[in-house]
Amino acid sequence: MALWGGRFSSGPAGDVFALSQSIDFDWRLAPYDLRSSLAHLNVLENAKLIEKSDAGAIRKVLKEMQVELAEGTLLPSDQDEDVHSALERVMTQKLGPLGGALRAGRSRNDQVATDLRLFAIDHMLQLAEFVIALQGAMLKKANEYKDAPAPGFTHLQHAQPVLFGHELAKHAHSLDRDLSRI
């Protein structure tokens, strides 16, 4: 789907189009774009800016696209400039002109910002799960080695002996602060 228009009689030269394409790296935003599109559809429907029957048809296609994306059968084409144009192209193929109805009331910049926020939240939650798993593993080992002596360090030099279990528990506990900042 061409994003170019207005006073131009044709699209950009091939090299310019290739330079402006971001589909190679922003396709990972597709699940978030579909989620934000469903939310935007709800807003349009609740504000009565889109007919209930049209909203139902769009919602059905968006959910089908989520399934296809998860299955790996929904893919961008070489002609898609970015994730948004790719998904709108598929919507328009499936729904005709109704597929472009989701453009109402939202800018491309807002769409990008929302998708990136959802992406970041999702990945931060995954990171938090990894940190919690690491803490659990460290505390399990801390209990296992609660009586094992180990060399303590201060200012990068050997200091008094400590219990290895205490060292592990100390580091596991210090990750609590990191978790609170995620």
Language-model region placement:
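A helix-coil-helix interface module used to build multimeric assemblies
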Residues: 1-182
